[in-house]
């Protein structure tokens, strides 16, 4: 059995190399690499996608850092965690940008030798701006379907994050 831990808060605070060193020293065999640590929920809502998803040189630097640090410290990148949220109600431009960030997450995951990417379903979770489960279901199906070519190309399996749920309109969980 391998014992793994999320890279938050070590990698955001100390960087990939030092973060992996600390995680290994704490006795872990591997990590769940959090891409969502590179951006906040508000960044995603405002279409402020981090440059690791948009700047080729920075993406390549992250990939190299992840591979080198994994080898150096004997830490397996067991799975990666995609950015959250993966859907924002009534923000089609943000949703297009987020989908591109998810595709880049698949690419990075595959290129560092990780075969599992956890992707959150469409989830509004807002009583202020309610959605129906059927709306979230449809966006999730569209999003996951759009990821299939990238998942196949990079040999990555998409795992669904389990989310709490409530239909804010019907008040049912």
Predicted regions and their residues:
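Bimodal feature
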Residues: 15-16, 125
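Catalytic domains of carbohydrate-active enzymes, especially glycoside hydrolases
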Residues: 16-39, 112-116
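A short glycine/small-residue-enriched secondary-structure motif
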Residues: 37-41, 75-79, 83-84
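Conserved protein kinase catalytic core
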Residues: 12, 38-40, 85-87, 167-168
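Hydrophobic faces of well-ordered beta-strands that scaffold small-molecule active sites
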Residues: 3-7, 31-33, 77-82, 117-119, ...
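Short polar catalytic/cofactor-binding loops
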Residues: 7-14
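Active-site acidic/histidine proton-transfer and metal-coordination neighborhood
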Residues: 64-65, 69-72, 76, 86-173
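Glycine-rich, proline-tolerant flexible connector loops at the mouths of alpha/beta enzymes
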Residues: 32-66, 124-128
